[in-house]
Regions:
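Short, structured coil segments at secondary-structure junctions
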Residues: 58-59, 67, 158-161, 216-217, ...
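Residue-level signal for inorganic ion chemistry
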Residues: 33, 67, 141, 214, ...
Length: 258
């Protein structure tokens, strides 16, 4: 059995099937390792409220949300890295200036999810906002575009060197967050809090913002469906998200307790 104290998994493209469900088999494996003293955690770009609704019976010990903007351990918030109200307004104004008034924006923080797209209104977790008078701090601002040059101009409205901006591989959006709001920074804060070496963590991921996490942790595992950049830094590659790759790799790592 590997010397692992914590399993961390991304959600979309990793723990989730493509339809955003988690199999009963995977839930049972997670419950088994938790009963045997192994911590299980989620590490996702989603806001906490937008992740919990899909877990259905899974109770993570660790919750890293907003791409690393916030960390919870046993439901206690232990790390927070967000844009101030003024910084959010500067970025939003720059987004409208660079892309025009019809650009689609989303923002999220500890308390909610906000979008100026009315397509989100069918989801009770989203709140419509035109962002013309938005007065809340946020961990993450997302812009519907893959134009890196324009996204860079938006980031430069603050200090581009202090902003992390990455595309999503599966949707035409960019995510902007503070430089320290990354999964690897969040894990470092968690390890400091728990007095735990990252070498005792196994992490699963599939997308750009999982790269730092997989490189930091003792065992970085890419999904078979991961982008090539993630596979290149991973220690191992497991089965795809559709094949319950996370759960099956946990069994291999933690036999006989999984």
């Amino acid at each position: 059995m590997a010397n692992i104290s914590l399993i961390l998994s991304d959600l979309d493209g990793t723990l989730f099937h493509n339809d955003k469900t988690i199999s009963y088999f995977t839930k049972q494996i997670i419950a088994n390792i938790q009963k045997n003293g192994i911590l299980f955690g989620i590490s996702t770009s989603r806001a906490k409220i937008n992740a919990e609704k899909f877990l259905n019976g899974i109770t993570p010990d660790v919750f890293i949300t907003n791409g690393g903007g916030m960390v919870f351990y046993k439901n206690k918030k232990i790390y927070n890295c967000e844009f101030s109200v003024q910084e959010v307004n500067t970025l939003i104004n720059a987004t409208f200036e660079v892309f025009g008034k019809d650009v689609i924006i989303s923002a999220d923080n500890e308390y909610g999810l906000y979008s100026n797209s009315k397509e989100e209104l069918g989801d009770k977790f989203w709140t419509y906002d035109d962002f013309l008078n938005f007065k809340q701090p946020c961990m993450k601002l997302c812009i519907q575009s893959l134009d890196k040059e324009k996204i860079t101009k938006v980031a430069e409205s603050l200090d581009a060197s202090a902003i992390d901006f990455l595309p999503f591989s599966d949707i035409p959006w960019y995510k902007l967050s503070k430089k320290d709001a990354t999964k690897e920074k969040a894990i470092t804060a968690l390890c400091d809090y728990l007095k735990l070496s990252p070498k005792k963590i196994a992490a699963f991921g599939d997308d750009f913002n999982d790269i730092g996490m997989l490189k930091l942790c003792g065992k970085g595992i890419a999904m078979q469906n991961a982008i090539d950049e993630v596979k290149q830094v991973a220690d191992e590659i497991c089965l795809s998200n559709e094949e319950d790759g996370v759960a099956k790799k946990i069994i291999q790592l933690l036999e006989p307790i999984a």
